[in-house]
Amino acid sequence: MTPLEIALKEYGNESFAGLPTNPDVLKYFTETGATFVHDDETPWCAAFMNWVFKQANIETPNKLLARSYENFGHPTVLQKLGDVAIFWRVTPESGLGHVGFFIRETDKLIYVLGGNEDSAVKIKPFPKTQLIGFVTY
């Protein structure tokens, strides 16, 4: 299966506010070596991507930072369905970000399938103005 197909099988998994912790979200951390994370309240977009790529036997930076995907794969400006989209949060210089699988785009928005999209695995739009770039693998 492709990484996008694996990610789609997880569609709808969500973290719970407070307790209990959803084991289907916690596995994104524990099965990729982040055993120090014990709840689903920790930001998990990068953990989700790490887990998906691990299932596809594709090596990633395996860090819990979305922007670590800037150093993954090959940069592309000809993005296709399933490529990785990387965004900044707060400010471009903050080091904070978001990462997900490219689905489609409009004039102003990029739609990605990712983890921790409003606390769930789902498709969500992000402003093109916050795009750092796309990578293919």
Regions found by a protein language model. Name each.
Residues 1-56:
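N-terminal capping segments
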Residues 1, 79, 136-137:
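Short intrinsically disordered terminal tails
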Residues 58-122:
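...with weaker cross-activation on analogous glycine-rich loops/strands in unrelated enzymes
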